[in-house]
Amino acid sequence: DHPNSNGVWYDVGNRDGLIVNNWLEGATDCFFFEISRGATVAGYVFVDCDKGVRVLNSADVHVYNNTFVDSTAAFERNERIATNDHFGWHPATGPDVDEREGHIFANNLLVTGSAYTQPLLRFEQPTSLCDTLTRPMATQVDGNVYARARPTGSGTGLPLIVISPAATESCVTTLTSLDALRELAPSLEANGQQLDRTPASIFKGPDLGRYELLQPIVARAREPKLPAHVREALGWSELDAQTKGAYPMNPE
């Protein structure tokens, strides 16, 4: 109920978590994974979060099949190390500065209403690291669906994805389409979809918190598959796993 609170926060030295099937709503960082290594997040619903998922100074966080409603997914890294840190030992429990990578973001569903204008996916690092950390934070970003109705009368699209490192003065670039992302980084979102759709055309009853898919979203032929151990943790069949977001495919 506190407007500036975090939801589920794994802070400092966590390893290889399997975190599935939950609903987080109305927090600043609904799921926060900080200074840690290894987590799989799947089957979550994030609603009205400043950041639905926030990954900070961590490595190997795999985010599969979650539903984001008016919520951003954010992966961040900065210069923080144990030397002269105000907590000292905290950064020493996680990956070193040059190891904060290896993330996966796949088969998620990100949907916004007309009032939401923020980017839906963010990878950010400060300018001071641009020359030293040149590899991307993620090893795979693919098969995600971004649904946002185009603003009436808008000549340009709203920001969709923030990418860093980038060859800009700020080390960050903001893109408004998946086509622009593929032009910049062809390996990203080869099977992603950007839809000009409202929440009411995607979900069974968004006004009532019913975020099951109204109709299946057709998958692309070569998009990533949900790993078997994650599918089993969710209790899904192989058919169920052909879905986007947190709710399984219902053949009926």
Question: Locations of the language-model features?
Answer:
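C-terminal accessory segments
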Residues: 145-148, 179-252
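Glycine- and acidic/polar-rich repeat regions and solenoidal domains
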Residues: 1-207
